[in-house]
């Protein structure tokens, strides 16, 4: 949420050919081509105004709807008060209907800052009667920021999350702090005969602490513990979240041969400013939660996404399969978010991702536990009638590359690349021994994304600086060239693997089947979208492409 200083999973559903925006009570659908500068098609954007953190994510089991709320200033394309929760709904986590402002702060000089949504099935709060289906008893837990105070408030909905009533005895949690925000609440079942209760993770931001509270009714909260000065601190903690995540196999710190449980707890903490790439970043800790205290399995700092534009991750409450963990993040960075060259909206969300814990071989001699990410999209609809292009078993030469020309480019596509480095004794003498893919604009090929792998550096790179948009040249925080470790997917065959989604002005890269991820925005001129892909290397026969498949999305 806005900082304040006191100083690949296919889902059945509707076609994603139109993002249906509804705002200010107007039910007229607005297509993604109505707006300027290449609005994304499969990443949610507000119809107009400013957006940042995702809030209040939940699944309505009665209507089979996914609900997304978000930090929203409808009056401008920069952050400002009054700040609301915007609201969008989807059947398939791909095509969204935007309902505009849903929950507000109550005064023009205040903000309804970030928070979460729970379903109060058993009416522990006393807000509901039998007229409200238990599956739709939505309660928002959020931060009211007004003047020097930040405190936790609750509001409830009697119509399935479209409108809200504020609790008359707010605030429910106030510690007399100006930096106390972003509550994430979940239900924790009791153990050993104890009753279940609500658990809140909330940031006391500028003392670098996540506080854990418990409550029987969402109104009265008791401090249980804190998680303080862990990981990468930056300038402050924000947007904490605690969730139990399933895994295939996890390396535990005891090296015990005993059988392991089928899940572990993951604590998310976002920091801004002060991320290792500059500005915003989200980290996570793997561990155990006993109902009062979170204990990490080790002292590592793990980052959820290695790109520049992935912040304030929040997970959904009440997924259809309770073991599944889905989440979404804000796809921007506070270093330049308010200057990004889009209009009449500013900012997009990431794709929804499904998270699991997996063993990950960072080198041939060791393995570690990481949070694996898989994009969640309605692939059946997106790939229907979409055009696919393929290259197989191609050894790249320095004289002749490969070129793919996209028919009727939409700007939204997926690609999957598997390649090997063939090796050479004198390759270290080459200044930059790269395999490069140039994703070029269809109307002006002087605007392009360049991405690929360089063997001497042992990393994948992205260059997003080749554009005529002044913002990209003038804002020095909009880092042009970025690198991320691209792990070998198979140390025996030396195969590298990367899956990518490009959507108008955002690219998400999933390395080693999602064990490493990088999300970054980029900006081309209006109506100049990816229309051609060139594959090149300056070093003869250093790389072989086992397969490269590109599919344009049906949007």
UniProtKB/Swiss-Prot annotation:
Main function: Has both inulase and invertase activity.
Gene name linked to the record: INU1
Root EC class: hydrolase
Effect caused by changing residue 168 to S: In strain: CBS 6556
Top-rank taxon, per record: Eukaryota
Catalyzed reactions: Endohydrolysis of (2->1)-beta-D-fructosidic linkages in inulin
Glycosylation sites per record: 32, 122-123, 129, 176, 220, 226, 255, 290, 385, 393, 490, 549
Cysteine-cysteine disulfides: none
Binding of substrate, residues: 50-53, 71, 113-114, 181-182, 238, 334
GO annotation (BP), single: sucrose catabolic process
EC number from the UniProt entry: 3.2.1.7
Keyword Ribonucleoprotein recorded: no
Positions of the pro-segment in this chain: 17-23
Keywords attached to this entry: Cleavage on pair of basic residues, Glycoprotein, Glycosidase, Hydrolase, Secreted, Signal
Record localization: Secreted
Cleavable signal peptide: 1-16
Catalytic machinery residues: 53
Name by which UniProt lists this protein: Inulinase
Entry GO terms, CC: extracellular region; fungal-type vacuole
GO molecular function: inulinase activity; sucrose alpha-glucosidase activity
Major site of localization recorded for this protein: secreted
Family, similarity comment: Belongs to the glycosyl hydrolase 32 family.
InterPro entries: ConA-like_dom_sf, Glyco_hydro_32, Glyco_hydro_32_AS, Glyco_hydro_32_C, Glyco_hydro_32_N, Glyco_hydro_beta-prop_sf
């Amino acid at each position: 949420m806005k900082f304040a200083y006191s100083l690949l999973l296919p889902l059945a559903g509707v076609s994603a050919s139109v993002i249906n925006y509804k705002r200010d009570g107007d039910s007229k659908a607005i297509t993604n081509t109505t707006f300027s500068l290449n609005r994304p098609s499969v990443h949610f954007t507000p119809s107009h105004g400013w957006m940042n953190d995702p809030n209040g994510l939940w699944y309505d089991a009665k209507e089979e709807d996914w609900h997304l709320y978000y930090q929203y200033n409808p009056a401008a394309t920069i952050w400002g008060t009054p700040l609301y929760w915007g609201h969008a709904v989807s059947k398939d986590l791909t095509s969204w209907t935007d309902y505009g402002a849903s929950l507000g702060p109550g005064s023009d000089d205040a903000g309804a800052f970030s928070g979460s949504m729970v379903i109060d099935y058993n009416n522990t709060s006393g807000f509901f009667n039998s007229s409200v289906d238990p599956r739709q008893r939505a309660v928002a837990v959020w931060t009211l920021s007004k003047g020097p105070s930040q405190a936790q408030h609750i509001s409830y909905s009697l119509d399935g999350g479209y409108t809200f009533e504020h609790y008359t005895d707010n605030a429910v949690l106030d510690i007399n702090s100006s930096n106390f925000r972003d509550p994430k609440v979940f239900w924790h079942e009791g153990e050993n005969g104890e009753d279940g209760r609500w658990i809140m993770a909330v940031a006391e931001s500028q003392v670098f602490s996540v506080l854990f509270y418990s409550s029987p009714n969402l109104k009265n909260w008791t401090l249980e513990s804190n998680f303080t000065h862990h990981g990468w601190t930056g300038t402050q903690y924000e947007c904490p979240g605690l969730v139990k995540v399933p895994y295939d196999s996890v390396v535990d710190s005891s090296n015990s041969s005993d059988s392991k449980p089928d899940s572990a707890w993951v604590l998310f903490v976002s920091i801004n400013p002060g991320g290792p790439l500059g500005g915003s970043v989200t980290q996570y800790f793997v561990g155990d939660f006993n109902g009062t205290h979170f204990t990490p399995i080790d002292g590592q700092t793990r980052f959820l996404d290695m790109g520049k534009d992935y912040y304030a991750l929040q997970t959904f409450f009440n997924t259809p399969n309770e073991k599944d963990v889905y989440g979404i993040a804000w796809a921007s960075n506070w270093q330049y978010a308010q200057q990004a060259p889009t209009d009449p909206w500013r900012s997009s969300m990431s794709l929804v991702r499904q998270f699991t814990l997996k063993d990950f071989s960072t080198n041939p001699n060791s393995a570690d536990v990481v949070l694996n990410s898989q994009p969640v999209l309605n692939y059946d609809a997106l790939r229907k009638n979409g055009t696919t292009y393929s290259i197989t078993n191609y050894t790249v030469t320095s004289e002749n590359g490969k070129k793919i020309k996209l028919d009727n480019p939409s700007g939204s596509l997926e690609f999957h690349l598997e390649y090997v480095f063939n090796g050479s004794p004198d390759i270290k003498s080459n200044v930059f021994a790269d395999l490069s893919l140039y994703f070029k604009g269809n109307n002006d090929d002087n605007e392009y994304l360049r991405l690929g792998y360089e063997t001497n550096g042992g990393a994948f790179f992205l260059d997003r600086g080749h554009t005529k948009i002044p913002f990209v040249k003038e804002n020095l925080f909009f880092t042009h060239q970025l690198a991320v470790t691209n792990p070998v997917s198979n140390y025996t065959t030396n195969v590298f693997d990367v899956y990518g989604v490009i959507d108008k002005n955002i690219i998400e890269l999933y390395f080693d089947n999602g064990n490493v991820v990088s999300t970054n925005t980029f900006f081309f001129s209006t109506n100049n979208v990816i229309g051609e892909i060139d594959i090149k290397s300056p070093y003869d026969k250093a790389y072989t492409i086992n397969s490269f498949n590109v599919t344009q999305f049906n949007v």
